[in-house]
Amino acid sequence: MTNIRKTHPLMKIVNDTFVDLPTPSNISSWWNFGSLLGLCLITQILTGLFLAMHYTPDTTTAFSSVTHICRDVNYGWIIRYLHANGASMFFICLYAHMGRGLYYGSYAFRETWNIGVILLFTVMATAFVGYVLPWGQMSFWGATVITNLLSAIPYIGTTLVEWIWGGFSVDKATLTRFFAFHFILPFIILALAMVHLIFLHETGSNNPTGIPSDMDKIPFHPYYTVKDILGALLLILTLLMLTLFAPDLLGDPDNYTPANPLSTPAHIKPEWYFLFAYAILRSIPNKLGGVLALLLSILILALIPMLHTSKQRSMMFRPFSQFLFWVLVADLLTLTWIGGQPVEHPYVIVGQFASILYFLLILVLMPATSLIENKLMKW
C-alpha cells in the first residue's frame, strides 16, 4: 500500500515541500534563513493576533491600550515585546537571507528573486504601519515624516498624501487604516512566501559552489529538518534573551511619550532596520531626489540578475568579488550607523560618501570586477 503522505492531495504538497524534497547535499547554514523567516512570520502573526484582541485603533485610547496590554493582560507584556523584538529578528533573518542570495548568486532564479524583492517591500510596509500603532511620539512623527515624502511627487503629491492620511494631518483616520493594513499585510506576505517557494521548487535550491547539483541530492527530511531545528532553537533563544533581558534595547525611548502634534522630538528616526535607507534619503539635499534615492536603494535589487557579468554563479571562487561584497556589507552598516545620528558634520558627509559607494558598488564596481575575474580565468 502506498504511503498516504505521497497520495493524499494535501499531504502530497507538504511531503514534496518538507519531506521528500531533493536538496543539494552541500548547502551551508546560510540556507537556514528561509525556514527561520517562516518561523518569524508565524510568530508575528500569532503574537499580533493576541495583541489585536486588546488593542484599540483610536488616537485617544491607542497609547493607553498598549499600556493596558503590558500591565493588565495576562502575559501581555511578553506578547507585546515578543512582537516588537520579533520584528527585529525578522529583519536580521531577512537581510542575512538576501546577503546569502547575493553572495552565492541565488538571484539567477529570476522569478524567485523578484518575488523576494516584492516580499521585502511588503515586509517593510508592514513594519512601518505597525510602528505607528502604539501612538507614541516616534510613531506619530515617523508616520508624518515618511508619508510626507510622497508630497515630493509632482502634481499629485499633496493630494496623494492627504488621501493616505484621510485628512489634513496624521490623525484618527490614519491610525485606523494603518491598523487595517497592519492586520491584512502579514497574510499577503504568507501568500507571497508560498509563491516564492513554488518558484524555488521549480528549479531546486542553489548551493555554495553555484554548480548544478542534480547528481548529488539528498532528501530534505531528516537531514535539513534537523539542521533547521538547530537554527530555529538559536533564533528562539536570541529572541527570548532580547525580550526577557533587554526588551527596549532596539526601541526608541521617545515612543514611551504619548503622541503630541505640538511637540516635535529632537531627532526623528525610524527603527534600526530602516536606518540605512533613511541615511540614503537624508544624504541628498533635495526632497524629490532623496525620495528617488530611497526607492532606488531597494529597487536596485531587482536589477541585480541583469548586472551579473561573471561566468561563475557563486562568489565562492571569486576573491575580488568577495572583497567587494564585504565592502558592501560594511557600507550598509556604516549607513545604518549614520541614519541614527543627527544631521550635522561629519555625519552628513560620511553618509553622502557611503550612499555614493552603495550605488557605485552595485552598479559599477561589482559587475566590472566580475569581468576582470573572467579575464583572469582566461575565459
UniProtKB/Swiss-Prot annotation:
Heme 1 (or BL or b562) is low-potential and absorbs at about 562 nm, and heme 2 (or BH or b566) is high-potential and absorbs at about 566 nm. Belongs to the cytochrome b family. The keyword Transport applies. InterPro entries: Cyt_b/b6_C (IPR005798), Cyt_b/b6_C_sf (IPR036150), Cyt_b/b6_N (IPR005797), Cytb/b6-like_sf (IPR027387), Cytochrome_b (IPR030689), Cytochrome_b_C_euk/bac (IPR048260), Cytochrome_b_N_euk/bac (IPR048259), Di-haem_cyt_TM (IPR016174). It comes from the Eukaryota. Its cofactor is heme b. The chain crosses the membrane at residues 33-53, 77-98, 113-133, 178-198, 226-246, 288-308, 320-340, 347-367. It comes from Balaenoptera borealis (Sei whale). It is found in: Mitochondrion inner membrane. Component of the ubiquinol-cytochrome c reductase complex (complex III or cytochrome b-c1 complex) that is part of the mitochondrial respiratory chain. The b-c1 complex mediates electron transfer from ubiquinol to cytochrome c. Contributes to the generation of a proton gradient across the mitochondrial membrane that is then used for ATP synthesis. Pfam families: Cytochrom_B_C (PF00032), Cytochrome_B (PF00033). One of its GO terms (cellular component) is respiratory chain complex III. CDD domains: cytochrome_b_C (cd00290), Cytochrome_b_N (cd00284). It is a multi-pass membrane protein. The cytochrome bc1 complex contains 11 subunits: 3 respiratory subunits (MT-CYB, CYC1 and UQCRFS1), 2 core proteins (UQCRC1 and UQCRC2) and 6 low-molecular weight proteins (UQCRH/QCR6, UQCRB/QCR7, UQCRQ/QCR8, UQCR10/QCR9, UQCR11/QCR10 and a cleavage product of UQCRFS1). This cytochrome bc1 complex then forms a dimer. This is Cytochrome b. GO terms for biological process: mitochondrial electron transport, ubiquinol to cytochrome c. The keyword Electron transport applies. Heme b b562 binds at H83, H182. Heme b b566 binds at H97, H196. Binds 2 heme b groups non-covalently. Keywords: Electron transport, Heme, Iron, Membrane, Metal-binding, Mitochondrion, Mitochondrion inner membrane, Respiratory chain, Transmembrane, Transmembrane helix, Transport, Ubiquinone. GO terms for molecular function: metal ion binding; ubiquinol-cytochrome-c reductase activity. Disulfide bonds: none annotated.
